[in-house]
């Protein structure tokens, strides 16, 4: 399960690191990111595929599509493959220079009718307007909690009536027993994909101050507060999942 022919294998944490520090999406992470996320996030490839299918349903002519926290552009490419209407544009945004550089290369390698603009910047500063679809694919969890509602409010305001937000996240759980079980099953998943206990432990230590997760109930509450009348989990595997939020017509 751990072999990846399309990208270098993630062995960044295979040996002890004296001063771990906090997680950063730097050049080293960007280089191995496809292998890392495939082996670390259960259901990731399914979510990416389904985001493309959702684009085929929700993207309307002469509208804009946003991939906020686009990393290497997997969701952007999936949407572009499935958009079959005229006059659309996809805008991908990420604050990591290493991710943006590689993302642009990936976008340039696959020509398609729908134009794509990749922006290096803070998603909190991006103007969202005339949007038929917005994707936050494992991005919100890296924002300061105080900024999360503000971003969702701006997304809601920038969406056209009937537009959709896809919000994928790692979840925490109010039920501690369920939370512990799914946490442990996720670690089983990573072990089955070839990660050692050292790799799992070091990565977790680097992420614990940077990636702050919320329960599904909190996500739904924020989405409803932003104005979305419809919000529900459409995909979940262990403690990873994705919600759909649809703006009223």
From Swiss-Prot:
Pfam families hit by this protein: Methyltransf_25
Keyword Lyase: no
Keyword Oxidoreductase among UniProt keywords: no
InterPro entries assigned to the protein according to its UniProt record, in alphabetical order: CmoA, Methyltransf_25, SAM-dependent_MTases_sf
Catalytic activity: prephenate + S-adenosyl-L-methionine = carboxy-S-adenosyl-L-methionine + 3-phenylpyruvate + H2O
Top-level taxon: Bacteria
GO MF entries: carboxyl- or carbamoyltransferase activity; S-adenosyl-L-methionine binding
Keyword terms: S-adenosyl-L-methionine, Transferase
GO process annotations (BP): tRNA wobble uridine modification
EC numbers for this chain: 2.1.3.-
Primary enzyme class: transferase
Coiled-coil annotated residue ranges, if any: none
CDD domains: AdoMet_MTases
Binding site for S-adenosyl-L-methionine: 44, 69-71, 94-95, 122-123, 137, 204
Family according to the record: Belongs to the class I-like SAM-binding methyltransferase superfamily. Cx-SAM synthase family.
Protein's job: Catalyzes the conversion of S-adenosyl-L-methionine (SAM) to carboxy-S-adenosyl-L-methionine (Cx-SAM).
Subunit text: Homodimer.
Protein name: Carboxy-S-adenosyl-L-methionine synthase
Gene: cmoA
